[in-house]
């Protein structure tokens, strides 16, 4: 029986996530890879047993959610390919923005006869509808506490063509690695006003170790590993104690390191930090 297609939504639902990753680390990493597609209003991740390996990312614009879904479908995230779909209903934060939010009568829902409850309704009652309903995982993220601070806002990068994956990311279905969608501009031309992606920082000869600079303060080893481990020959990321803005990435050989450097040169981990990559000095 065919599953009805869910219409585009501000919120995307992600499952098949690595359940061993801590909640705070997972939210930071999801923000790091999805913020490039537009303003993120919230990311919902739950510790509950039923919702492990799942998350909701809420964008301000539907187009941002669409770009994220198409570009990142199947992306290897902590060694597992992400499965992404639209949420079936608006999240509360979006409903409030639209003026369609309706406070739920949870007591009435709980008194509903069990014989009339569907599995989806049961989950919605348990979770309080804090997050949108999606696919076979119906209802909200149960037990999610309110955010303790305002969500970080990442503005959409002007000029990014629809469904264009960031440099080096897995392309949409039907495109070979490195191939651009029809009509798309090369990565160096994606963002008008952006500083040119960096000529090589030095004339260092090819090396199997890359030197990264201009990294944002929130960069950590896991974030960089997720970017580079999609390339053949990746071995490890090494951070420099006391310096958040630089790092080293090691590959098996110079050719593999060069391919990763060319693909991720100028990649923006945040809107204001275009990563600069060169071969490390031997």
Swiss-Prot record:
Q: Which Pfam families match?
A: RRM_1
Q: Which residues carry this modification: N-acetylalanine?
A: 2
What InterPro entries does the record tag this protein with?
Nucleotide-bd_a/b_plait_sf, RBD_domain_sf, RRM_dom, U1A_RRM1, U1A_RRM2
- Where in the sequence does UniProt note compositional bias of the Low complexity kind? 119-141
Which ranges of the sequence are coiled-coil?
none
Q: Which SMART domains would you find in this protein's record?
A: RRM
CDD domains the UniProt entry points to: RRM1_U1A, RRM2_U1A
**N6-acetyllysine: modified positions:** 60
Chain residue ranges for the region called Disordered: 101-141
Q: Name one GO cellular component term.
A: spliceosomal complex
Q: What is its main location?
A: nucleus
User: Known Gene3D superfamilies for this protein?
Assistant: 3.30.70.330
**Omega-N-methylarginine sites (modified residues):** 152
What molecular functions are annotated in GO for this chain? identical protein binding; RNA binding; U1 snRNA binding
Query: To which protein family does this belong?
Result: Belongs to the RRM U1 A/B'' family.
The entry's function note states: Component of the spliceosomal U1 snRNP, which is essential for recognition of the pre-mRNA 5' splice-site and the subsequent assembly of the spliceosome. U1 snRNP is the first snRNP to interact with pre-mRNA. This interaction is required for the subsequent binding of U2 snRNP and the U4/U6/U5 tri-snRNP. SNRPA binds stem loop II of U1 snRNA. In a snRNP-free form (SF-A) may be involved in coupled pre-mRNA splicing and polyadenylation process. May bind preferentially to the 5'-UGCAC-3' motif on RNAs.
What is the protein name for this chain? U1 small nuclear ribonucleoprotein A
Q: Which organism is it from?
A: Bos taurus (Bovine)
In the record, what lineage is assigned to the organism producing the protein?
Eukaryota, Metazoa, Chordata, Craniata, Vertebrata
Q: Which gene encodes it?
A: SNRPA
């Amino acid at each position: 029986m065919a599953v009805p297609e869910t219409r585009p939504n501000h919120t995307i639902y992600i499952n098949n996530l690595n359940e061993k990753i801590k909640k705070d680390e997972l939210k930071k990493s999801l923000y790091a890879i999805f913020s490039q597609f537009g303003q993120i209003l919230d990311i919902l991740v739950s510790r509950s047993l039923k919702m492990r390996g799942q998350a909701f990312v809420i964008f301000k614009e539907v187009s941002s959610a669409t770009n994220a879904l198409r570009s990142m479908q199947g992306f290897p995230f902590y060694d597992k390919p992400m499965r992404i779909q639209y949420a079936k209903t608006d999240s509360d934060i979006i409903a409030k923005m639209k003026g369609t939010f309706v406070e739920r009568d949870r007591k009435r829902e709980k008194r509903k006869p069990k014989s009339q409850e569907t599995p989806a309704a049961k989950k919605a009652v348990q979770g309080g509808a804090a997050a949108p309903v999606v696919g076979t995982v119906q209802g909200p993220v149960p037990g999610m506490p309110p955010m303790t601070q305002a969500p970080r806002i990442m503005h959409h990068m002007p000029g990014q063509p629809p469904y264009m994956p960031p440099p080096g990311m897995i392309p949409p279905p039907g495109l070979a690695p490195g191939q651009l969608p029809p009509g798309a501009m090369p990565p160096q031309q994606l963002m008008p006003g952006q500083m040119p992606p960096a000529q090589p920082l030095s004339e260092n000869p090819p090396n199997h170790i890359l030197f990264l600079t201009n990294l944002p303060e929130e960069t950590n080893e896991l974030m960089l590993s997720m970017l580079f481990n999609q390339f053949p020959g990746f071995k490890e990321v090494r951070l420099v104690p006391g310096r958040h803005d630089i790092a080293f990435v090691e590959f098996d050989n110079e050719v593999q390191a060069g391919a990763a450097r060319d693909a991720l040169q100028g990649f923006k981990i945040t809107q204001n930090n275009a990563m600069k990559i060169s071969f490390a000095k031997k």
